[in-house]
């Protein structure tokens, strides 16, 4: 039925994304993205627009779909209306690449 058709399509898309990421890791050690589309927003600020709220997490979706390890680390702040708001970057590694994430994350943070 409809459930099977959507489920099978979703799995095909997931496999395609996983293949693209796996191919990318033949050319790089980690993939770096923003953690969110913008700085942190006030609690409850986007509850009236769920799509806008979900789009803030758009960069973290790929690692969830591929099952590849990812970590977010602080990368600075930005001044929004007199308030310093945190920014972060996300590091994504290939399957079983958790140790690589810790090494790169520590280097970025100046801890190694």
Roles of regions detected by a PLM:
Residues 1-65:
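Serine-dependent amide/ester hydrolase catalytic core
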Residues 1-19, 27, 64-112:
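Structural helix-boundary/capping segments
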């Amino acid at each position: 039925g409809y459930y099977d058709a959507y489920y099978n399509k979703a799995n095909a898309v997931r496999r395609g994304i996983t293949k693209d990421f796996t191919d990318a890791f033949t050319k790089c050690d980690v993939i770096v993205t923003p953690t969110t589309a913008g700085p942190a927003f006030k609690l409850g600020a986007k509850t009236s627009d769920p799509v806008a709220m979900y789009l803030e997490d758009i960069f973290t979706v790929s690692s969830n779909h591929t099952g590849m390890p990812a970590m977010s680390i602080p990368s600075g702040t930005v001044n929004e209306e007199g308030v310093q708001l945190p920014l972060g970057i996300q590091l994504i590694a290939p399957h079983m690449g958790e140790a690589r994430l810790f090494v790169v994350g520590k280097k970025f943070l100046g801890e190694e």
